[in-house]
Amino acid sequence: MAEAGASKGGEEPGRLPEHEEEEESPLWHGAGHCKWFNVRMGFGFISMSSREGSPLESPVDVFVHQSKLYMEGFRSLKEGEPVEFTYKKSSKGLESIRVTGPGGSPCLGSERRPKGKTVQKRKPKGDRCYNCGGLDHHAKECSLPPQPKKCHYCQSIMHMVANCPHKTVSQQPTSSQGRHEAEPQPSTSAFLREGGGTYGYSSPSYSQEGRSEISERSGRSPQEASSSKLSASPEEPSRKGPSVQKRKKT
């Protein structure tokens, strides 16, 4: 029983006593300037020139993260910027806990910004802003408030591009030209069959003497000659017509 009580009251092997806890590393106060700072990664190093008010023989580097900077907006440090800070010693080295400007003022910060977070201007490629009509940006980048809708072709607010009269006028000559080319030319045989009443043309008038003269030469009567002219191909009247007119003039 005594042994059991002693084992219970004694300390377990492998455990540190409660009074032997690790003490936190103490904080020191230092001053110096920013050695370098990467604005994209958000960290850098401070060159400490004095500690607890006493100058150091050689500068000591202290790690600094952007989360430890006392300032508003985008947190960063400018190279050579004077700072005051509190720091501690860790397994990785000296790390800053809080960084301010001289006298506890906010840090100034660097003017540089990460390239990935800045809004890059779009190069004009012929595109047009649908809001204001500008060529150097798109509608989502337009600084003006939403403008009234207007035609993208002539920039008029009276109609949309689907009903633009200027666009239809520019396309009309090409369509009308194709329509005229597609229309077939009327043949001379149609003029003869219709009696010359179409398009203001009239069929050539032959006198009775001319008809009899033609029928005598061909050996047919005037009625047969006239019927043969109507049943002939379209090319025959065009060849015979001028020859008959020349005979009449002579």
From Swiss-Prot:
Share an example GO biological-process annotation for this protein.
Answer: miRNA catabolic process
- The residues the record assigns to binding Zn(2+) 2 are 151, 154, 159, 164
Q: Where are the zinc fingers (CCHC-type)?
A: 127-144, 149-166
Q: Name one GO cellular component term.
A: cytoplasm
Chain intervals with Basic and acidic residues compositional bias:
9-18, 210-219
Q: What is its main location?
A: nucleus
Q: Where is the composition biased (Basic residues)?
A: 114-125
What are the Polar residues biased-composition ranges? 168-177
* Binding residue positions for Zn(2+) 1: 129, 132, 137, 142
Q: Which PROSITE patterns match?
A: CSD_2, ZF_CCHC
Q: What single Pfam family name could you report for this chain, choosing any that match?
A: Lin-28A-like_zf-CCHC_2
Keyword terms, alphabetized = Metal-binding, Nucleus, Repeat, RNA-binding, RNA-mediated gene silencing, Zinc, Zinc-finger
As for subcellular location, the record says: Nucleus, Nucleolus
Q: Which SUPFAM superfamilies match?
A: Nucleic acid-binding proteins (SSF50249), Retrovirus zinc finger-like domains (SSF57756)
Biased segments, Low complexity type:
200-209
InterPro entries assigned: CSD, CSP_DNA-bd, Lin-28_RNA-binding, Lin-28A-like_Znf-CCHC_2, NA-bd_OB-fold, Znf_CCHC, Znf_CCHC_sf
Region Disordered: start-end pairs: 1-27, 98-126, 165-250
Location of the CSD domain? 29-102
Q: Name one GO molecular function term.
A: mRNA binding
Please state which protein family the record places this protein in. Answer: Belongs to the lin-28 family.
PANTHER family xrefs: PROTEIN LIN-28 (PTHR46109), PROTEIN LIN-28 HOMOLOG B (PTHR46109:SF3)
User: What function is annotated for this protein?
Assistant: Suppressor of specific microRNA (miRNA) biogenesis. Binds target primary miRNA transcripts and sequester them in the nucleolus, away from the microprocessor complex, hence preventing their processing into mature miRNA. The specific interaction with target pri-miRNAs occurs via an 5'-GGAG-3' motif in the pre-miRNA terminal loop.
Name of this protein: Protein lin-28 homolog B
Q: Which organism is it from?
A: Gallus gallus
Q: What is this protein's gene name?
A: LIN28B
